[in-house]
């Protein structure tokens, strides 16, 4: 990770606020930990890499798929992005809203819903960040990406390849791969 703004965000966002009390003493270890509903908070390296791959500029309109603990959401907001975030698990959605409010991080929109559908009513987006492993590239999300926009998405079943998809034209995309990772699965029609 070489982006100083990303490193600064990771250093300045208190990760322990986003974790279950049982794991707070380990909050600054570079590991993923369980949160509610069999989900996880990603390890700091993964959060930093995904954020760096987005190449965020102040004011970028970003769609985040999988609010989860809201740690990644906070990093994006800290970097002055306009964040629209969606979470399929209601308990996580409620908890993340509370934590974001407590820390005074306000996304443009925080929604309980199906991430596979995205938020077309608020698109198109400069960037899309998917924080769960997708078995395939969701076509609905590609449609919500601006021309010249980037989507960072882990693709695969048991393990995933971190992938950046750049929209070149209406139906033309470029893909770049950045190594293997393990994420909780991105599920369709499951809210």
Regions found by a protein language model. Give the residues of each.
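Class I SAM-dependent transferase core
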Residues: 1-63, 67, 71-79, 92-106, ...
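Conserved nucleotide-cofactor-binding alpha/beta core module
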Residues: 55-174
């Amino acid at each position: 990770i070489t982006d100083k703004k990303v490193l600064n965000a990771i250093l300045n966002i208190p990760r322990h606020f986003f974790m279950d009390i049982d794991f707070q003493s380990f909050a600054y270890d570079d590991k993923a930990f369980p949160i509610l509903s069999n989900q996880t908070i990603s390890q700091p390296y993964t959060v930093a890499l995904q954020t760096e791959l987005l190449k965020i500029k102040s004011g970028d309109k970003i769609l985040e798929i999988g609010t989860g603990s809201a740690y990644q959401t906070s990093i994006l907001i800290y970097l002055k992005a306009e964040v629209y975030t969606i979470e399929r698990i209601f308990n996580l959605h409620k908890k993340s809203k509370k934590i974001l409010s407590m820390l005074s991080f306000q996304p443009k929109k925080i929604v309980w819903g199906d991430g596979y559908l995205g938020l077309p009513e608020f698109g198109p987006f400069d960037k899309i960040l998917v924080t769960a492993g997708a078995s395939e590239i969701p076509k609905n999300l590609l449609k919500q990406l601006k021309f010249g926009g980037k989507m960072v998405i882990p693709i695969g079943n048991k393990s995933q390849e971190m992938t950046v998809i750049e929209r070149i034209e209406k139906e033309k995309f470029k893909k770049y791969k950045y190594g293997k990772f393990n994420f909780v699965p991105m599920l369709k029609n499951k809210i």
